[in-house]
């Protein structure tokens, strides 16, 4: 046997041991024997570097530090699931599927893992890329870190897998590994992780793959995607994937009746704590991929799936105090400080009280015994008070402040709103810092600056509003403690680069109340310059799709303030994009043609297809009518659109047909 054959055999043997140990829990060698073989392989690879293989089991533990994570567009959007906490919600889902399909169907019931979603791309049996969910359209490339997760195969077994496919799953932090690392962190005087989900998410974003490899993350795969899948059954495809080396849970049941579904949910609701990982519900999926395609999707969720969330656990603890926090828009949020208590695997110290109405309804007093639960919210909430345990004297009632806790300005409350606001946004420190943080965020100006740095700049008097960022010089920063010249240069360059950010993102970054990313895009399209937007009236604004009186009044109020107008004049002076750059058509092959885009695409994203349509003289529309010329259809086109297209005689074209049109 030559050296190359010996190395190949060792790799194959260790891959097989890894699979048996981490995926199917059937180890066939001792840890000592495994480590011995791995060291032998490492030694041979070091002696014969010409036989290096990126997919060797020795390459699971990374040695390099990543400086950042690249942004990757998903081939298929990673949609979030609609969820329900009630049997009524399950029945509504089941009956809706029954009505739309009007044929027999099967529901696959699976556990809902409480971890981090991941998308894995394989080509020719090799792991090509691993991407986080991100915003559903774009995620972080965490391939280097995912390669250290031993239950994820770098090379697949067999040869009956598609040449190119995507498989999705959940990265979980098993309870044993989670408890072990928290014990170590406490012994090292480090703060423990709050829960396995947060720990898994933080670990995936760790810049050192060696740290990731030491934390023993696990992965369960739950959905196969691609053009050439072997079966129409979601369940059968997962069983095939298990044979290729993927870890697929055996806790899946194909149900034909609502009773079978409820039995599955009830069983695992009772026994969920016996599992080696955290779960927070059950996912129901229509098993047939053909039927999934017929059912399609709504805006952010597939119609063919729903998550049933287990009822939240409730605990009793003591209220010590209430903090009133000031957000970037001036909203005052009350937060309860509690006696630490264990709730659903998490140490809870704080709970949201939301607003004054809830405080009054609870009749809250300092020292009260509170009932706290953690449902679908990240921050737990107080749901009740044990008034019988309240002392007859000495308990101070919790009263909502009349003045801002940060700047002492009298608070205001708008009609039909539950929140109180501090109107002093030009001088209230938390609002100023929050506005600058929002303006600099990735989705807005993408300036390389964090909250701690903004705090440092604020204390030094370098910033009091968003425009001040463009006045900070390298010498100003070098006067501050712990700032090196390279860091100062990087910050200033990042600020200069932000001047190329398009108008709609600048508009979003201004932080106008109720103006999120989508609304900002619509405003920028309707009013191509900031000057036009600043003089728009209520009638002009409310004619825009998706903009009602509340948003319109907020925009008008923003531009009626002289401080804001002065701020915009400064931003314009510094060279920010406060106008829409008119697109120049590359071609006019689609001139006069209107398109609707529907479904999920493989070659390009929906946004890219919209751009191609406009660049070739076509027009994108959002609603289907007899005037629509084409529907550019991907996978999972909605059934309603299909029916309307047939009624209006609209031509439905595929990706390939569209691309031929613009060749």
Swiss-Prot record:
GO terms for cellular component: cytosol. InterPro entries: BRCT_dom, BRCT_dom_sf, DisA/LigA_HHH, DNA_ligase, DNAligase_adenylation, DNAligase_N, NA-bd_OB-fold, NAD_DNA_ligase_OB. GO terms for biological process: DNA repair; DNA replication. The gene is ligA. Gene3D superfamilies: 5' to 3' exonuclease, C-terminal subdomain, 6.20.10.30, BRCT domain, DNA ligase/mRNA capping enzyme, Helix hairpin bin, Nucleic acid-binding proteins. Its EC number is 6.5.1.2. NAD(+) binds at residues 31-35, 80-81, 110, 133, 170, 285, 309. The keyword Ligase applies. This is DNA ligase.
């Amino acid at each position: 046997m030559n050296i190359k054959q010996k190395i190949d055999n060792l790799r194959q043997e260790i891959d097989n041991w890894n699979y048996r140990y981490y995926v199917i829990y059937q180890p066939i060698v001792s840890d000592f024997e495994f480590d011995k073989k791995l060291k032998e392989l490492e030694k041979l690879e070091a002696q014969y570097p010409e036989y290096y293989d990126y997919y060797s089991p020795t390459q699971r533990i990374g040695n390099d530090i990543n400086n950042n994570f690249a942004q990757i567009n998903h081939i298929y959007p990673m949609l979030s699931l609609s969820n329900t906490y009630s049997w009524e919600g399950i029945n509504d889902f089941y009956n809706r599927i029954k009505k739309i399909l009007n044929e027999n169907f099967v529901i696959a019931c699976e556990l809902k893992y409480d971890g981090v979603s991941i998308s894995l791309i394989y080509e020719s049996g090799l792991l090509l890329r691993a991407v986080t969910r991100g915003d559903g359209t774009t995620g972080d490339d965490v391939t280097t870190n995912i390669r250290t997760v031993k239950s994820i195969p770098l090379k697949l077994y067999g040869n009956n897998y598609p040449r190119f496919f995507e498989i999705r799953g959940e990265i979980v932090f098993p309870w044993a590994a989670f408890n072990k690392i928290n014990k170590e962190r406490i012994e090292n005087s480090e703060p423990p992780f709050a829960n396995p989900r947060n720990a898994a998410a933080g670990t995936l974003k760790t810049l050192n793959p060696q740290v990731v490899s030491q934390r023993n993350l696990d992965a369960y795969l739950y959905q196969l995607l691609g053009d050439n899948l072997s079966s129409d059954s979601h369940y059968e495809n997962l069983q095939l994937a298990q044979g290729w080396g993927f870890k697929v849970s055996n806790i899946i049941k194909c149900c034909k009746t609502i009773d079978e579904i409820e039995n599955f949910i009830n069983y695992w609701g009772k026994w969920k704590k016996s599992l080696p990982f955290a779960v927070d519900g059950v996912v129901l999926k229509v098993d047939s991929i053909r039927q999934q395609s017929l059912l399609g999707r709504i805006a952010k969720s597939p119609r063919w799936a729903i998550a049933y969330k287990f009822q939240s656990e409730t605990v009793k603890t003591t209220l010590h105090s209430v903090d009133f926090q000031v957000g970037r828009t001036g909203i005052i949020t009350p937060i309860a400080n509690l006696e630490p208590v264990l709730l659903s695997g998490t140490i809870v110290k704080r709970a949201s009280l939301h607003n004054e109405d809830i405080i009054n309804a609870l009749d809250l007093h300092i020292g009260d015994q509170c009932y706290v639960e953690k449902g679908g919210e990240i921050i737990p909430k107080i749901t009740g008070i044990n008034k019988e345990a309240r002392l007859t004297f000495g308990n101070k009632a919790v009263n909502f402040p009349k003045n801002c806790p940060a700047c002492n300005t009298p608070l205001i409350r708008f009609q039909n709103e539950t929140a109180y606001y501090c109107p002093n946004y030009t001088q209230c420190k938390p609002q100023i810092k929050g506005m600058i943080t929002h303006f600099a965020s990735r989705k807005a100006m993408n300036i390389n600056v964090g909250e701690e740095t903004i705090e440092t700049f604020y204390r030094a008097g370098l910033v009091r509003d968003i425009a001040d960022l463009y006045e900070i010089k390298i010498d100003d920063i070098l006067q501050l403690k712990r700032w090196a010249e390279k860091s100062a240069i990087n910050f200033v360059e990042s600020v200069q680069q932000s001047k190329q950010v398009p108008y709609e993102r600048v508009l979003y970054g201004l932080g106008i109340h109720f103006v999120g990313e989508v609304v900002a895009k619509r405003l920028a399209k309707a009013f191509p310059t900031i000057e036009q937007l600043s003089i728009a009236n209520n009638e002009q604004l409310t004619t825009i799709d998706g903009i009602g009186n509340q948003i319109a009044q907020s925009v008008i109020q923003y531009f009626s303030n002289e401080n804001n107008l002065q701020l915009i004049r400064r931003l314009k002076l510094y060279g920010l994009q406060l106008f829409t750059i008119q697109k120049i058509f590359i071609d006019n092959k689609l001139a006069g043609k209107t398109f609707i885009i529907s479904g999920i695409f493989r070659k390009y994203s929906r946004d890219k297809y919209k751009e191609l349509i406009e660049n070739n003289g076509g027009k994108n529309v959002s609603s289907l009518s007899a005037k629509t010329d084409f529907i550019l259809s991907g996978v999972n086109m909605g059934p309603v659109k299909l029916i309307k297209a047939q009624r209006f005689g609209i031509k439905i074209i595929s990706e390939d047909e569209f691309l031929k049109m613009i060749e």
